[in-house]
Swiss-Prot record:
GO terms under cellular component: cytosolic large ribosomal subunit
Description of post-translational modifications: One or more lysine residues are methylated.
Record's protein name: Large ribosomal subunit protein uL11
PANTHER family (UniProt xref): 60S RIBOSOMAL PROTEIN L12 (PTHR11661), LARGE RIBOSOMAL SUBUNIT PROTEIN UL11M (PTHR11661:SF1)
One BP annotation, GO: translation
Role of this protein: Forms part of the ribosomal stalk which helps the ribosome interact with GTP-bound translation factors.
UniProt lineage: Bacteria, Pseudomonadati, Pseudomonadota, Alphaproteobacteria, Rickettsiales
Gene3D superfamilies registered for this protein in UniProt: Ribosomal protein L11, C-terminal domain, Ribosomal protein L11/L12, N-terminal domain
Complex and partners: Part of the ribosomal stalk of the 50S ribosomal subunit. Interacts with L10 and the large rRNA to form the base of the stalk. L10 forms an elongated spine to which L12 dimers bind in a sequential fashion forming a multimeric L10(L12)X complex.
Family assignment from sequence similarity: Belongs to the universal ribosomal protein uL11 family.
SUPFAM superfamilies hit by this protein: Ribosomal L11/L12e N-terminal domain (SSF54747), Ribosomal protein L11, C-terminal domain (SSF46906)
Length: 145
C-alpha cells in the first residue's frame, strides 16, 4: 500500500470545539481545496470532551486528493502558565521590568509533565527549565526550589 502524496501542511491554533469556516481556518483550508465543513465537524467532534475555548495547536496535513489528516498538540505553555498564575495576559515589558504574577516551581514541573509530548526533551528537569523560561519571558516570577 502506497502513501498518499502530501500537498502541504497547515499549522493553526484552534480553540477546542470552536472550529468554524471563519478566518483563519476557512481561508487556510480553502486555498488548498480542503472541505472546510468536514474538517470543522471532525475537529469539533474530536475536541468535544475538552474545555471549550482551550487553544490547541493543530498540524493539518493536506494530501494531493484534497483529503486531510490532523494532529492536535497540547495547549501552549503560556495557556497553562496564565491559568496557574490566575492572570489573563502576560507582561508586555521585558522580564526584569514588570512582574505580573507568580508561579511555583511545582507548577512549572506539572506543566512540563503535561507538555512533555511536544517538547524537544525527554528529561523532566530540562522540560521544567523550558517552562520556567517561558514563565520569565511572560513576566511571571518563579518561586520555590
Amino acid at each position: 500500500m502506497s502513501q498518499k502524496a502530501i500537498k502541504g501542511y497547515i499549522n493553526l491554533i484552534i480553540p477546542a470545539g470552536g472550529a468554524t469556516p471563519a478566518p483563519p481556518i476557512g481561508p487556510a483550508l480553502g486555498q488548498r481545496k480542503v472541505n472546510i465543513k468536514t474538517f470543522c465537524d471532525e475537529f469539533n467532534n474530536s475536541t468535544k470532551d475538552m474545555d471549550k475555548g482551550v487553544p490547541l495547536p493543530t498540524l493539518i496535513t493536506v494530501y494531493e486528493d484534497s483529503s486531510f489528516s490532523f494532529k492536535i498538540k497540547t495547549p501552549p505553555a503560556s495557556y497553562f502558565l496564565k491559568k496557574y498564575a490566575k492572570i489573563t495576559k502576560g507582561s508586555s515589558a521585558t522580564k526584569k521590568e514588570a512582574v505580573v504574577g507568580k508561579v511555583t516551581m511545582d507548577d512549572c514541573r506539572e506543566i512540563a509533565k503535561l507538555k512533555m509530548p511536544d517538547l524537544n526533551t525527554k528529561d523532566i528537569e530540562a522540560a521544567t527549565k523550558i517552562i520556567c523560561g517561558s514563565a520569565a519571558s511572560m513576566g511571571l516570577e518563579v518561586v520555590g526550589n
